[in-house]
Regions:
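The conserved acidic donor/metal-binding loop of glycosyltransferases
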Residues: 273-277
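Long helical/loop segments within the catalytic core of UDP-sugar-dependent glycosyltransferases
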Residues: 245-268, 280-366, 377-378, 399-445
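N-terminal membrane-anchoring/stem segments of glycan-assembly enzymes
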Residues: 2-184, 236, 447-450, 571-598, ...
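Short, acidic, metal-binding catalytic loop of nucleotide-sugar glycosyltransferases
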Residues: 209-218
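Structured alpha-helical
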Residues: 539-740
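Cell-envelope/extracellular polymer assembly enzymes that use nucleotide-activated donors
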Residues: 189-191, 220, 371
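Membrane-embedded multi-pass helical conduit in multi-pass membrane proteins
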Residues: 50-57, 95-149, 443-528, 543-604, ...
Length: 740
């Protein structure tokens, strides 16, 4: 079993695995995968070299393509455009269902999901039996590879549509269970664990204060400091919570949690990452579930109180949802129905006795949370998911940190193939649970088709290959209905958390780094240790991530050249594919490259749009106004009509009646009103608590934003291409500087 130790020096937040001493680094799953790839490669080479047996096999496949099953082919009609009727009917049915059920119900979800699943099977049957171009080895290899990549890209979606039939909501159950907790009839002891490794003190302080504000008496709060900082120990003492540490950092976060579990005694255990702040009703809404002895763990969503770097860099903070939203709003409920909820490592509550049965948290992977949940399921415990935003944390603050975080998640998940907690083989799981976990594992393999699709128009144009044999009637009758329905209902099915077009931007940004990580994991699954995502950082300059941009720049140039060639040779075979696909790739790659420009982040604190009444006191005068933004650092205020403010003032927030001293750092007159920035000064611990509770702990404050539909998403992409993003960002930075 690997052990993990902290790296000394400049590697902030890095745990490095010790060498295991194995003589054979390639493990059995890796050898099986390489053998399968070698077998497929040998067939392809044999076909290219003209091997008679292999050639005969593909001649027969070509005969199947030339004489496809009639049920897959379009009917013969006097006008091909009559073949649009099925697409129009499906589109209208989808619109009617979405109009009748703006929020998907179990029945409507199953109806639409079942229809999509049928069209999925029909489409891939047609692709397999009717559209392959295997007339010669070169076209054939390209055509079959494209089909395989399409299937790999969409198989996860097919699994999701199948699992939709088991989707579950526990809100009503939470309403019932919370009654006993609020009335004091069920109040088990709760230990709240906050593991920390190098996070700034002000972030951990915010989390501690949020945990102390929870509406629950029988709780103990523990800071688990894996860097043994004197300042963190003093912070815990100052705020009145427990401080735990250990002599080494073996097994990273999992080891930290396991060490704490052996020193604490609460019946239930809550884990919050150092940057996650709960709302005051977190325990009221979750503890009651454990009255049922079968419940081993309850997960709640990971929400974020700042925008992810992709949305921020594109200037779409108020439009895009965090990438994780589709997982917590759509995938976790269907996983809950299948009994395969994913433990996300934070914002969850578990039964101590259940953790003891599995020897606490799993230590042989960097995704200790995921595999701990699998072991609990295998032991017969039920993992539940409550789809309510009861906490919020800090999203990665730069595009580089965002990608590194995804690479860690992917690396940890794919380590499933190499450890005993493999959800596909571990005893105790049923077929539905294994299917749901297979969907999660397959997700990380979609980087291969995503990257391959970027090369398709380039290969098609330069090599003059035609990977898809199709006609206009087939396109209208088979391809169009499937994609039109999927585009129409995708965001509705996932509860408006993600659109296909905008989601593809996220996929392109991370596809190439994830692909290299997947290959590394398959060759050396434990070659890299746990890397903590840096949090609480500020920067005063633009930063373009050239390491991520370089491969995309090359792809953009090659795609542009292939597009121009296709434009002049449009009538030729294969060129129409290069033209249409190339145009799409040009748009998405260009927008993806825009996301790599990190904006300056001048404050360590988040400023929230919040309008409420405020009074300023100074020079024996009262100045009434309204807040525009509030943070732990200060407040932006509008006073209408404009007045002359003294430099030092007292700020009274209404209706909280929170009074804090402050200093006016910026002010300007706009349309007869005074806009002023007031920085708080000499904030006491109690005042800071009130600010944290106001900004982070109010139940229901973390909104569920709805993503634009596909048509709106397409318009957003084109607007991004047309507007001068760098100048927009410069303007935003100037506005930001007014606050600091």
């Amino acid at each position: 079993m690997q052990t993990i130790k902290p790296v000394s020096g400049n590697g902030r937040g890095i745990y490095e695995p010790k060498k295991s001493g194995l003589n054979f680094p390639l493990q059995l799953p890796t050898l099986l995968i390489l053998s399968a790839l070698g077998f497929v490669g040998a067939i392809a080479i044999s076909w290219l070299l003209g091997n008679s047996h292999v050639t005969e096999l593909f001649v027969r496949l070509h005969l199947v393509q030339s004489n496809p099953p009639q049920w897959l082919m379009p009917p013969q009609l006097s006008n091909n455009y009559y073949l649009l009727i099925p697409t129009l009917i499906l589109f209208l049915v989808a619109q009617v269902v979405m109009k009748l059920f703006p929020e998907p119900t179990v029945l409507s979800q199953r109806l639409v999901g079942g229809l999509c699943l049928v069209l999925f099977v029909r489409y891939f049957a047609w692709r397999s039996f009717c559209s392959l171009n295997v007339a010669n080895p070169v076209d054939g290899i390209f055509s079959i590879t494209l089909l395989g990549m399409e299937l790999l890209a969409m198989i996860g979606t097919a699994f999701q549509l199948l699992l939709l039939f088991t989707a579950k909501s526990r809100t009503a159950q939470a309403d019932r269970c919370s009654i006993a907790v609020k009335e004091g009839r069920y109040n088990p002891t709760v230990d709240i664990l906050i593991p920390t490794y190098n996070e700034p003190d002000f972030i951990v302080k915010r989390t501690i204060m949020g945990c102390q504000a929870l509406n629950y008496e029988r709780k103990q709060i523990y800071v688990l400091d894996d860097t043994r900082r004197q300042s963190m120990k003093q912070l815990a003492q100052e705020l009145g919570c427990h401080y735990l540490t250990r002599p080494d950092n073996s097994h990273a976060k999992a080891g930290n949690l396991n060490s704490a579990l052996k020193q604490t005694h609460g019946e239930l255990v809550v884990v919050f990452d150092a940057d996650f702040v709960p709302t005051t009703n977190f325990l009221e809404r979750t503890v009651g579930f454990f009255h049922n002895s079968k419940i081993g763990l309850l997960q709640t969503p990971q929400s974020y109180y700042n925008s992810d770097p992709i949305a921020r860099n594109l200037g779409l903070e108020n439009v895009l949802t965090p990438e994780e939203e589709v997982f917590y709003r759509y995938l976790q409920p269907i996983r809950d129905g299948a009994g395969s909820v994913v433990c996300a490592g934070t914002s969850f509550i578990a039964r101590r006795s259940a953790l003891q049965e599995i020897d606490y948290f799993v230590t042989d992977s960097v995704s200790e949370d995921y595999f701990t949940g699998i072991r609990l399921s295998a032991k017969g415990y039920e993992l539940a998911y409550l789809n309510e935003k009861l906490s919020a944390g800090l999203a990665a603050e730069s595009i580089g940190a965002h990608i590194d975080q995804r690479l860690r998640w992917g690396r940890g998940t794919l380590q499933a193939f190499f450890i005993k907690s493999n959800p596909l083989t571990i005893p105790g799981l049923n077929p539905w649970q294994r299917l749901a976990h297979l969907e999660g594992l397959a997700h990380w393999l979609t980087c291969f088709p995503r990257v391959f699709f970027l090369f398709v128009p380039i290969i098609s144009t330069f090599a003059q290959l035609n990977p898809i044999n199709t006609s206009l009637p087939e396109t209208l009758y088979v391809t169009l209905p499937y994609y039109v329905l999927l585009l129409s209902v995708f965001s509705w099915l996932n509860r408006r958390s993600r659109s296909i077009l905008l989601s593809d931007i996220y996929s392109i940004v991370q596809a190439i780094p994830v692909l290299f990580t997947v290959v590394k994991v398959l060759l050396n699954p434990f070659g890299k240790g746990f890397i903590v995502t840096p949090k609480g950082m500020a920067r005063d300059k633009f930063n373009y991530n050239w390491s991520l941009a370089m491969p995309m720049t090359i792809l953009l140039g090659a795609t542009l050249i292939s597009f121009c060639i296709s434009l002049f040779k449009f009538p030729e075979a294969g060129m129409s594919l290069g033209l249409v696909w190339g145009a799409y790739n040009l748009v998405t790659i260009a927008v993806a490259m825009m996301t790599l420009l990190d904006l300056p982040k001048l404050s360590l604190y988040e400023w929230y749009n919040r309008k409420q009444e405020v009074n300023l006191y100074g020079d024996r005068h009262v100045y009434p106004g309204k807040t525009q933004k509030i943070s732990e650092e200060g407040v932006e205020i509008v006073l209408d009509p404009a007045v002359h403010l003294p430099t030092n003032v007292m700020v009274e927030l209404i209706p909280e009646i929170l009074v804090v001293s402050g200093r006016v750092t910026r002010s300007c007159t706009v349309d007869g009103a005074l806009n002023a920035i007031v920085k708080f000064q000499n904030v006491t611990t109690e005042q800071h608590r009130e600010l944290v509770e106001l900004l982070y702990c109010r139940p229901g404050q973390w909104e569920t934003r709805k993503i634009p539909n596909e048509l709106q998403s397409g318009l957003i992409l084109f607007k991004l291409l047309l507007r001068p993003l760098v100048f927009l960002n410069s303007k935003k930075v100037k506005q930001m500087k007014l606050h600091y």
